[in-house]
Amino acid sequence: MQWLDLPHVQRAQGNVRLPGSKSISNRILLLSALAEGTTMVSNLLESDDTGRMLDALRLLGVAIVRTDDGKYRVAGCKGKFPVREAELFLGNAGTAFRPLTAVLALMQGHYRLSGVPRMHERPIGDLVDALRQIGAVITCLEHEGFPPLEIHPAVIRPGNISIKGNISSQFLSGLLMALPLTGEPVTIVVSGTLISQPYVALTIAQMARFGVQVKQESWQRFMLPENQTYRSPGKIAVEGDASSASYFLAAGAIAGGPVRIEGAGSDSCQGDIRFVEALEAMGARISMGSDWIESGAPDGGALKAIDFDCNHIPDAAMTLATMALFARGTTTLRNIASWRVKETDRIAAMSAELRKLGARVEAGDDFLRITPPDGPLTADAVIDTYDDHRMAMCFSLVSLSVPVRINDPGCVAKTFPDYFEKFAAITHTPF
């Protein structure tokens, strides 16, 4: 489908069962593959990103079977992939590319990792430099600091590692998941401010489910004790994706509600669950249980503009940018520098598409300032999505004010293949 025309809808109301979290799904797949024992994974996200991880693990010799009831049985390889030479194509899946780079660098094998052109523009130099500190031999095949990569057999000498924290938390997460494979004590020191800290906390939580503990001092120093090995918990469930919840919760706040999402709530280990704090600041009515959240429009009807630090919700923060179109006043989103190195340059892309709708936008290195138009949004705008799933999902919210065309709606397959069907269900429109 080249485009999707969304009609103007008056109200959003209903319940949505969330797909599994992308971030948790790919972490659990990798840890299950590295563990001793067999793991049965339920509610795994079925998407392009998780498909890339599944394909890669199978190429590396991991036995993975999808059962008739939609679960995945992963036979762990006790920390050593059977296949020692492979070429892996990982699309634009950062949650597969970064941790696999770290793990494969310790495997004493010969591997090539590549992706789509955009992945080759996304920096990985800080992770490569950190791995080289302990003896890894990694060649950047086109431009230093960027994929594609070639990994060679190497003598690994675990010890202290320093890594920058200001580009992507996935670099640190990859190191944390990989280094227990050495069996040696390792200390990782983060230089500068660590962005997206909740995603690191998420990594540590998943590692604990497989029996490996990480000690930390603030967000600057992480210690991995010696002689730890991953052990299967037997059965493990993936909680619903909190980033994906943001679109439906936003719809409820914009267009009446109530909209309830099921599969993530107050017990969630995901940082993006804090999106509800921004909704509350905008005046939305929020209620929450252990595994559900419900949103509705403010009692007065109109959302308020906010000035919000988005460091803890880098993905869900994109939803706030489109919500700003419905708020009174100027909304400022801060600490979003990581948007520049995501599936597209999200600061530039979001700025361009918001302007098509009549918004006034000021963009900086790490912030966006958005003022909605004085009158109605521009109807029938054609929104480009830049092969970025979150751009497509964010701008679906525009239909709560005016008709809108979304180009390349199929890009949502990266994390949420049936998103538009779920959106149509709560807006009571045909799809």
UniProtKB/Swiss-Prot annotation:
Keyword Transport found: no
GO biological process: amino acid biosynthetic process; aromatic amino acid family biosynthetic process; chorismate biosynthetic process
EC number: 2.5.1.19
Pfam family of the protein (one): EPSP_synthase
Single annotated GO MF: 3-phosphoshikimate 1-carboxyvinyltransferase activity
GO cellular component, one term: cytoplasm
Sequence positions that bind phosphoenolpyruvate: 22, 94, 122, 170, 346, 390, 414
UniProt binding sites for 3-phosphoshikimate: 22-23, 27, 168-170, 196, 315, 342
Gene3D superfamilies (alphabetical): Enolpyruvate transferase domain
SUPFAM superfamilies, sorted: EPT/RTPC-like (SSF55205)
Keywords: Amino-acid biosynthesis, Aromatic amino acid biosynthesis, Cytoplasm, Transferase
Signal peptide (residue range): none
Location(s) in or outside the cell: Cytoplasm
Active site: residue positions: 315
Catalytic activity entry: 3-phosphoshikimate + phosphoenolpyruvate = 5-O-(1-carboxyvinyl)-3-phosphoshikimate + phosphate
Segments crossing the lipid bilayer: none
Pathway: Metabolic intermediate biosynthesis; chorismate biosynthesis; chorismate from D-erythrose 4-phosphate and phosphoenolpyruvate: step 6/7
SUBUNIT field: Monomer.
Its biological purpose: Catalyzes the transfer of the enolpyruvyl moiety of phosphoenolpyruvate (PEP) to the 5-hydroxyl of shikimate-3-phosphate (S3P) to produce enolpyruvyl shikimate-3-phosphate and inorganic phosphate.
UniProt similarity note: Belongs to the EPSP synthase family.
HAMAP family per UniProt: EPSP_synth
Name listed for the protein in its UniProt record: 3-phosphoshikimate 1-carboxyvinyltransferase
